[in-house]
Amino acid sequence: NTTLAFVKNYENGDREFSFYRHPGADMMLSSDEVEYEQIKQSRLFHFGTLSMTDDNVKEATKRAIETAKNNGLIISFDPNLRPPLWKSLDDARNQIAYGLSQCDVLKISDNEIEFMTGTSDFDKGANILMERYPNIKLLNITAGADGSYSYYREIRAYVPSYLLGGTIDTTGAGDTFCGSVLNLSLIHISEPTR
């Protein structure tokens, strides 16, 4: 089966996710099905924790990350916390911490940074993560209607959100943001800034 995600949109812009997944094809990927040669020929490897909720796919993800790191790829991570997919939030926190320890580029949402740092202050949260995980070179926070923040070395950038009138659903906006950041990274960075 293909995992199905259902999104309920509230009038205030918040969303609630529910899933039809057990089992889903995304949970069943094993290490021997990963295209390691394709990873080795790439410049960037992006992953999230949705592929770390179950043992087989978690092992496949970790081996893919190891292959990417061993071949000098830029490693990008988006926690993409979806509580209904986890056995426990402690397990989610542990796997997110693993992802944070592996990445060069991080895209994290406002609720995820609070989940991992205990603060809703983005500057404090970014400092906590970058001190705890010095491997993170570029940290991006998406905050929905409150815009986005980027941190690189001593530089902090803020961009207000851009909403068109009549916007109904922003699902996927964070993924689009992340894809755009990664595209620009590949254009302007010839090698990871490790």
Each language-model region and where it sits:
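Glycine-rich beta-alpha junction loops
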Residues: 1, 23, 81-83, 112, ...
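Conserved N-terminal subdomain of the carbohydrate kinase-like
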Residues: 1-49
